[in-house]
Amino acid sequence: MSNEISRNWPAPAKLNLFLHINGRRADGYHELQTLFQFIDCCDLLDFRVTQTPEQILHSDMSAVVADSDNLILRAAKSLQQATGYPGGAEIWLEKRLPMGGGLGGGSSDAATTLVALNQLWDTQLSNDELATIGLKLGADIPVFIRGFAAFAEGVGERLQAVTPTEFWYLVIAPDAHVSTAAVFQDPLLPRNTPKLGIDTLMSQPWANDCQDLVVSKYPQVAKALAWLLEYAPSRMTGTGACVFGEFSSQQQALAALAKLPSDMQGFVAKGMNISPLIVRLNRP
């Protein structure tokens, strides 16, 4: 087994179809309500089980490999420590998703690492156990482990499966890095959106409570969102910088992409209520 490479484990992006900030807890974390949906644009990871306990990461992005605090390595080590597995893994990351854009790429990479190595190491942890490990590494990781579109509450850890419409999306990645920590620490961030039941939230217009703040501070995000709103209902995902517009067909999304100004970068993706990772996990 140590010489075999298990290939093409997807780490899909997510969109926050809405994001409401309901308050700040005593520990500094924020209470929120959000709706996660996956899209079919993914990072790809390959794994090789090794007899030695080290975790080795390769990537086409040198900045990822140079980061000793990388979530992929932390996830592998956390699973190893939780299970006492004596071996290790060599991991290859093909980075396709924009970094720091609100698409959850780092969290998704970590979740795919936990799910894949749990199978390849035959450590037999349940999804609940994997999600518990993942939550210690990042609040978004459990939704990627569980692999279904979800309404999330709390700090994002309480998940309820939902089936929003699987639209086609045009995602624009502005040339801006938005610090999630800075957004949540900003005194101008709204923190008083009333908590509502899921049925009410699913039936009313969707919004992102972080959007106005980020748009006011990042002209690149404001420009991308203003352009996209000319073609479709559009919002920011997470704390940005990525924005997305929803279309009823791939043809419509591609037609808008063809008009994208030359100083913007974007891609078309399909909404998915079941993660590509779950499809890969269940493959023979």
Curated annotation (Swiss-Prot):
Gene3D superfamilies registered for this protein in UniProt: 3.30.230.10, GHMP kinase, C-terminal domain
Transmembrane segments: none
Keywords assigned by UniProt, alphabetized: ATP-binding, Isoprene biosynthesis, Kinase, Nucleotide-binding, Transferase
Keyword Kinase: yes
Pfam families assigned to the protein according to its UniProt record, in alphabetical order: GHMP_kinases_C (PF08544), GHMP_kinases_N (PF00288)
Active site: 14, 140
Protein residues bound to ATP: 98-108
GO BP: isopentenyl diphosphate biosynthetic process, methylerythritol 4-phosphate pathway; terpenoid biosynthetic process
Biological pathway: Isoprenoid biosynthesis; isopentenyl diphosphate biosynthesis via DXP pathway; isopentenyl diphosphate from 1-deoxy-D-xylulose 5-phosphate: step 3/6
Catalyzed reactions per annotation: 4-CDP-2-C-methyl-D-erythritol + ATP = 4-CDP-2-C-methyl-D-erythritol 2-phosphate + ADP + H(+)
GO molecular function, one term: ATP binding
EC numbers for this chain: 2.7.1.148
Signal sequence residues: none
Recorded family membership: Belongs to the GHMP kinase family. IspE subfamily.
Function statement: Catalyzes the phosphorylation of the position 2 hydroxy group of 4-diphosphocytidyl-2C-methyl-D-erythritol.
Record's protein name: 4-diphosphocytidyl-2-C-methyl-D-erythritol kinase
Protein source organism: Shewanella sp. (strain MR-4)
